[in-house]
């Protein structure tokens, strides 16, 4: 059952017509700014992939994919849940070099999503991926990319306020980002659930990048589920903002430096997913045939929620 609510006494800053205009403006401005900032080029994205390739996102490993068979060839296809793995292969196939990347307008169906104000069966994302050097696989590099994305959000917001004066009563976000690991967050709030920890910290500190998601913490449990075959769990995170109308933190982007052959090898075993080693994508990563990359997804709908109040 959906848990979507409209907060008491909530009044939108824009009427319905201007809201639609503003949504289009946000999508255009942010995509252009993100591409300029990270040196990305738009490519077309698939709506579905062959199940046998291992390219679909398994999310937490329990969500059912929308699957269908194709009459021509008897191929089993799956509607994408994200393009996390597809993008890395595409960078190789398209011949992208170090320092350049791609982004897609990704549309997905997640049939097992729990519905609320922030989650839908239909998922839209700017899915992006960029080729990096092996020596760029560091926390410092990851943090610099996070700061670049937040700066793109702030630049979009300032332009939006200039175009829609009705939004000028909303407070502007700053480019400042607080970085904290999931273990540090658990140590700070040991008696709270992971989501309660996020809410408490982001309400106090504002824009936050929560790092190192996927591996078990000292408590024996991971902060949140994360697939073992695209993000390096030591070099990933969620970009969190405070949502004032909903009075909660929420994730604008999940992103990270992608697995090396060594980290995929370790994480597949940790997650009990060694059977995936036989899939074409996983073979390619383990053999070192795919480029080192960083990437993530950014939700246009969530960005509009953030900037339109």
Give names to the regions the model predicted.
Residues 5-11, 124-125, 260-262, 284:
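Short acidic (Asp/Glu) and glycine-rich catalytic loops that position anionic groups and cofactors
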Residues 29-37, 148, 152, 306:
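Generic, well-ordered alpha-helical scaffold segments in large soluble proteins
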Residues 18-25, 29, 137-144, 148, ...:
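Generic recognition of stable, solvent-exposed alpha-helical segments in well-folded globular domains
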Residues 99, 104-196:
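Extended, charged alpha-beta segments that form solvent-exposed binding/catalytic grooves
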Residues 2-119, 127-131:
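Class II aminoacyl-tRNA synthetase-like tRNA-binding/catalytic domains
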Residues 109, 179-309:
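A translation/RNA-centric and nucleic-acid-associated enzymatic feature enriched
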Residues 68-70, 92-98, 118-120, 169, ...:
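A general structural signal for short secondary-structure junctions and capping/turn motifs
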Residues 36-43, 158-163, 306:
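Surface-exposed helix-capping loop/turn segments at secondary-structure junctions
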């Amino acid at each position: 059952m959906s848990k979507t609510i409209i907060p008491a006494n909530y009044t939108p800053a824009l009427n319905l017509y201007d809201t639609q205009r503003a949504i289009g403006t946000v999508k255009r401005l942010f995509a252009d700014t993100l591409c300029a900032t990270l040196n990305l080029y738009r490519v077309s994205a698939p709506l579905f992939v062959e199940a046998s390739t291992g390219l679909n996102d398994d999310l937490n490993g329990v969500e059912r994919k929308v699957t269908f068979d194709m009459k021509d060839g008897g191929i089993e296809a799956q509607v994408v849940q994200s393009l996390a793995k597809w993008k890395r292969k595409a960078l190789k196939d398209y011949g992208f070099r170090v320092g350049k990347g791609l982004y897609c307008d990704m549309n997905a169906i997640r049939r097992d999503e729990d519905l609320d104000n922030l989650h839908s069966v239909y998922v839209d994302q700017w899915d992006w991926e960029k080729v990096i050097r092996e020596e760029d696989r560091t926390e410092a590099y990851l943090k610099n990319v996070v700061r670049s994305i937040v700066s793109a959000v702030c630049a979009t917001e300032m332009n939006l306020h200039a175009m829609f004066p009705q939004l000028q009563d909303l407070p502007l976000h700053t480019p400042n980002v607080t970085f904290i690991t999931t273990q540090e967050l658990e140590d700070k709030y040991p008696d709270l659930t992971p989501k309660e920890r996020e809410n408490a910290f982001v309400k106090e500190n504002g824009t936050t990048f929560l790092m190192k998601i996927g591996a078990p913490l000292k408590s024996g449990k991971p902060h949140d589920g994360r697939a073992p075959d695209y993000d390096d769990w030591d070099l990933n995170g969620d970009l969190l903002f405070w949502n004032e109308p909903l009075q909660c933190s929420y994730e604008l982007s999940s992103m990270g430096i992608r697995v090396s052959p060594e980290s995929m090898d370790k994480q597949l075993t940790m997650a009990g997913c060694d059977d995936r080693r036989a899939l074409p994508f996983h073979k390619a990563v383990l053999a070192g045939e795919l480029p080192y990359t960083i990437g993530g997804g950014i939700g246009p709908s969530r960005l509009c929620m953030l900037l339109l109040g």
